[in-house]
Amino acid sequence: MDITTAVKSLAALAQDSRLEVFRLLVQAGPDGLAAGEIAERLGIPASTLSFHMKTLSHAGLVEVRPESRFNYYSANFEAMNALLGYLTDNCCGGRACAPAAATTRKRKFS
């Protein structure tokens, strides 16, 4: 993955509803979910969901599969793993990120 693709993927996920949709699709596995079911589970209007799915699809993070009258969406696990690999290689020097990096310390103010 190159930096342009990584930025595009991260930008697509940098919005609450889109991140929730992506998390739901990852949890649903390779079969994915119908658009109506995604909207119902997350309480998102169909028109809003359509906008978010378009953004995630353009970033390559989701795939759509038409079946009969419905569109089924699934996470693109290859793209997700490529993004995780890019972050690990380029942000953590190829090593697992240290636990200290994931914690925050409280600052003392004078």
Positions of PLM-derived features:
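Amphipathic alpha-helical dimerization/coiled-coil segments
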Residues: 1-5, 26-27, 77-110
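N-terminal helix-turn-helix DNA-binding core of bacterial DNA-binding proteins
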Residues: 4-5, 9-45, 67-79
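Histidine-centered divalent metal-coordination motifs
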Residues: 18, 51-52
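Alpha-helical residues within the helix-turn-helix
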Residues: 40, 57-58
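Short coil turns linking two alpha-helices in DNA-binding domains
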Residues: 45-46, 52
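Divalent metal-coordination and catalytic microenvironments
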Residues: 49, 56, 73
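Conserved catalytic-core motifs of GNAT/GCN5-like acyltransferases
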Residues: 65-67, 97
